[in-house]
Amino acid sequence: MRILAKWLALAVLLCTTPAKAALDIVITEGVDAARPIAVMPFVWQGSGAAPQAIADVVMSDLVRSGTFKPLDELGLPQRNIGTAAQFQANSWSSVGAEALVLGTVKPYGTDQYLVSFDLIDLVKAQNQALKGPVSATEFLMDSRQTVISAAQFRQYGHRISDIVYEKLTGIRGAFLTRISYVVVNHTQKAPYQLMVADYDGVNEQMLLRSPEPLMSPTWSPDGRRLAYVSFENKKAEIFVQDLYTQVRTKVSSFPGINGAPAFSPDGKSLAITLSKDGQPEIYIIDIATKAIKRITNHYAIDTEPSWYPDGKSLIFTSERGGRPQIYRVELSSGKVSRETFEGEWNLGGSITPDGRSMIFVNRTNGKFNIARMDLSTRFMQVLTSTRLDESPSVAPNGTMVIYGTTYQGKQVLAAVSTDGRFKARLPAGQGEVKSPSWSPFL
C-alpha cells in the first residue's frame, strides 16, 4: 500500500488550482527541424473585412503538429492569390517549401460563406515547369469547396489542416479532436473543475464543478462520454457523463478505492481499480449492467489499467516486482507478463492506436519523464526533459502525447511528439492544470 498511497496523495495534491478561458500553447523545441510549407492568406472576395482568417488556423495547426514549419508570408514570391489557376510555378523555384495551401472566401447568402482551397505540390510543380508549361491538374494534390456559417470558420480551418496533413504525411490529421483535463480554483467554494476544449485549448467548456477532487477523465471511443473519478460524496466514485445530454451515471461506488477508469474499445465496459476485496486490483465493469469481473489477483498493488486496441489485453501498473512496473494481462487466459525493465519505475502506460508502441512515465535517477517503447524491439526512448511528468495521453493518430508536468513550480500541460523532436507547453493563465486526456477522432 505504500506506493499506492504515494500515488493517490500525489494525485490529490496535484488536483488543485484554476484556469482561464483557454490554454496557451508555447512551442519550446522542434520547429527548426520541421518540413517547410507555404500557407497563403485566403483571399476575401466580399466587401468589408473578412469574417475570420482561416489561414491562421491552418498555420497554427501545422506548426503544432511538429511536422511542418509554415514560411513567413512576406518572403513568398506571389501575393493575393487564392486559386491554383493563379499559381506561377516558375516564381516558386527558390522557395524551398514542399507544398502550398491557398484559398478564397466569399459571401454565399445570409450568414453563409463559400470557402475554396487548393493544395499544390510545389516540388512536382517546379519539376514540371522545367519541362515547359503545365496545367494545374498536374500538381494539384487536393481542391475543395464547402459552404459554412460564420460560426464554423475555425472548425473548417481544422478540417483543411486535417486534409493537408494526411495528403503530405499519409497519416490522418487530429486537429478536430478535443482534450479534457482538470483545473482547480481555490478562491471558489467549488474549486475543482472538469474541462473540455479543442485540442489547441480553444472553446473551453466546464462540464462539472465540485467542492471535492475530480480526477482521471477518460474518453469513450465514440467521443460522446467521459468517465472520471469524483470525491463529491466524500469518497472515490466513478461516473460516466454524456457530453451532449449532460446526463451523469454512477458506475462504481464500492468501499475503498474506485479509480483509474479506462473505456474498452467497444465502449461498453470500463477497466477500473477497486480495493473492495483488500488490495487494489484490476476489474472490468459493464457500464449498463454494472456486472464486474476481477482480472488480477495478487498481494501487491495493481492499478492504472489501459486497453490494447484489439480489446484482448490490458496493461497495468503493479508493484508485484518490488517497484512499480508495467505488466500485460491477456483477458482470455489471465496470463500476466512484465513489459518494462529499464529505469527505476515505469507506470501509467497506454498503447498507441496502431498497437506498436507503449507510452508511459519512466523514472530514472529520480526523474519522472514520458517515454516510448517499441513493443517489437523493446527499445525505449525518453521523450521529455521536463519535471515530474505524469498522465500521458496519446493523440488518436499516434503522433503526439499530451501530459501533465511542472513548470516554474506550477502544474501545466505539455505536449511532445512520439519521436521526441517537437515539444510545447500548454500553461493556463490562472492556476494549475492536470490529468489530460486526448479524445478519439470526432
UniProtKB/Swiss-Prot annotation:
Signal peptide limits: 1-21
Pfam families in the record: PD40 (PF07676), TolB_N (PF04052)
Entry's localization field: Periplasm
Top-rank taxon: Bacteria
GO annotations of cellular component type: periplasmic space
A single GO BP: protein import
UniProt keyword Cell cycle, yes or no: yes
InterPro entries, sorted: 6-blade_b-propeller_TolB-like, PD40, Tol-Pal_TolB, TolB_N
The entry's keywords: Cell cycle, Cell division, Periplasm, Signal
Main location: periplasm
Similarity-based family: Belongs to the TolB family.
Oligomeric form and interacting partners: The Tol-Pal system is composed of five core proteins: the inner membrane proteins TolA, TolQ and TolR, the periplasmic protein TolB and the outer membrane protein Pal. They form a network linking the inner and outer membranes and the peptidoglycan layer.
Biological function: Part of the Tol-Pal system, which plays a role in outer membrane invagination during cell division and is important for maintaining outer membrane integrity.
NCBIfam families xref list: propeller_TolB
Name the UniProt record assigns to this protein: Tol-Pal system protein TolB
Organism placement in taxonomy: Bacteria, Pseudomonadati, Pseudomonadota, Gammaproteobacteria, Alteromonadales
